[in-house]
């Protein structure tokens, strides 16, 4: 009986894959709904439905992924929740998905994840003229991260401003604030000197005038 059930399960997935390949959305979802009666974890059900909808470029997939990730979070399965958002973000650069991913990485204090998700979110927000939203995000996250991560995060923000917001009239202020954060960190941890130099190198490649101003600011501050 178990072998029969396993074979039926496998056949059902082959049918779903076939319907997806043939572009038959409703038939794929019909088989999926029948199959989900045998799946005990709701998060998996929503995640798989999101995968099917995503294959048909249906924006409803994002809603399913949000539900799946929230269910994983409630169950304490943080890595699964992050994986759902990462998967969704690979196929759809969505502001809400990337904001949720950023918040997840903040919660688990994953520095690389925090920085990478913020960079991706910054690009979208600045292209949509939502700079103030990003500034609020920086303020909100500042109480949740260490000083070094905060400096690196502001460096990402400055880079994004120079890349995607040519009208950023307050760029000098943001650069000076980022330099202050780095210099404060360097008082206690010289290992982050390379991070400051990376920031200056990026600045030089993107805006030579601001780079020269940054060097002057550092020389006056030290």
Describe the function of each predicted region.
Residues 1-222:
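Repeat-based scaffolding regions
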